[in-house]
Amino acid sequence: MNAMNAEGRTFKGVLYFGLIVTEQGPKVIEYNCRLGDPEAQVCLSLLETDLLEIMNAVIDGTLENVEFSNREGGAIVVMMCSGGYPEAYAKGKEITGLKEDGQNDSFHYIFHSGTAFKDGKYVSNGGRVLGFVCLGDDVKDAQDKVYANIDKVAFENSFYRHDIGGKR
């Protein structure tokens, strides 16, 4: 940011920092000029304020005039990945448990990150395939909902973490 300012360039946008907590404290592992994925999926699921209004205010320099509003409660996103990810993984595995619109009524949202629609079926097409979002009265409630239902959707060699939102 200092280098951009020194060149007379103004940054207006989103800065995303990927962090990890280590024994030595938090460390930055990446940063981007975009929303993080799947982090944005869970955060935006709670946002009630129009995102376009927010981004226009960022561009116009009037963000202090935007009244932010979020849903009450908590949210959680759990990613379903292809076996082998983040290394080599197979593509084209049929995904079961999705409706024609790519959703499942057990979840508030299912975000397609690495899917394709071939021959009338959803198939895996990446490492991080689906992001399952549930909302709840609090994070624990959302966590209970997502883990109670995530096995309703599956594909060969799929896996997901069991510790999102705290140890289970």
Indicate where each model-derived feature is located.
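Active-site "cap" helix and flanking loop/linker of ATP-utilizing ligase/carboxylase catalytic domains
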Residues: M1-Y16, N32-D105
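Short coil/turn motifs at beta-sheet boundaries
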Residues: K12, Q24, R71, V123-N125
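General structural feature for long, well-ordered alpha-helical segments within catalytic domains
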Residues: L15-Y16, K27, C43, L47-L51, ...
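Short beta-strand elements
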Residues: F17-V21, P26-L35, G114
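Residues in well-ordered beta-strands of folded domains
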Residues: G18-I20, M79, T96, F111-G114, ...
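Generic structural motif
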Residues: T22-Q24, G36-P38, C81-Y85, D137, ...
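Generic long, charged, amphipathic alpha-helical segments
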Residues: A90-G131
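Generic C-terminus detector
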Residues: T115-D119, V123-R168
